[in-house]
Swiss-Prot record:
GO CC, any one term: cytosolic large ribosomal subunit
Disulfide bridge map: none
Keyword terms: Ribonucleoprotein, Ribosomal protein
Subunit structure: Part of the 50S ribosomal subunit. Contacts protein L32.
GO molecular function: structural constituent of ribosome
Family to which the UniProt record says this protein belongs: Belongs to the bacterial ribosomal protein bL17 family.
Top-rank taxon: Bacteria
Gene: rplQ
Cited PANTHER family: LARGE RIBOSOMAL SUBUNIT PROTEIN BL17M (PTHR14413:SF16), RIBOSOMAL PROTEIN L17 (PTHR14413)
Pfam families: Ribosomal_L17 (PF01196)
Keyword Ribonucleoprotein appears in the UniProt entry: yes
GO BP: translation
Protein name: Large ribosomal subunit protein bL17
Length: 129
């Protein structure tokens, strides 16, 4: 029975899935917008939003927790130095998921994942596949 099991497996082992979401989170925090499949985007929200909430209070313990999840010192610095203060007044809902059509090869539904209130730029979204 699958009672109380709320996350998707996405045809990956646990370690592969966690590594994939860690890499996607680092890409999202670095570029502030990524393109991925819709199911991955919906599951990524559960991984990223608690990290941004963690970044709103800059304590040593929170920085260590963030480093444990991200494994990238530059992204931890950006999380606590730039993103945490940016979303200080927002009580959640830091990501926006926009449907982006279908992938040409296998017709998979695609989505843009972007940080809300990000500075506007003309850069194209980064593929996170």
């Amino acid at each position: 029975m699958r009672h109380r099991q709320s996350n998707r497996k996405l045809n990956r082992t646990t370690s592969h899935r966690l590594a994939m979401f860690r890499n996607m989170t680092n890409s999202l925090l670095k570029h502030e917008v990524i393109k991925t499949t819709l199911p991955k985007a919906k599951d990524l929200r559960r991984f990223v939003e608690p990290l941004i909430t963690l970044g709103k209070e800059s304590t040593v313990a929170n920085q260590r927790l963030a480093f444990d999840r991200l494994r990238d010192r530059e992204m931890v610095v950006k999380l606590f130095g730039e993103l945490g203060p940016r979303y200080q007044a927002r009580p959640g809902g830091y990501l926006r998921i926009l449907k982006y059509g279908f992938r040409k090869g296998d017709n998979a539904p695609m989505a843009l994942v972007e940080l809300v209130d990000r500075p506007e730029s003309d850069a194209a979204p980064v593929d996170a596949e």
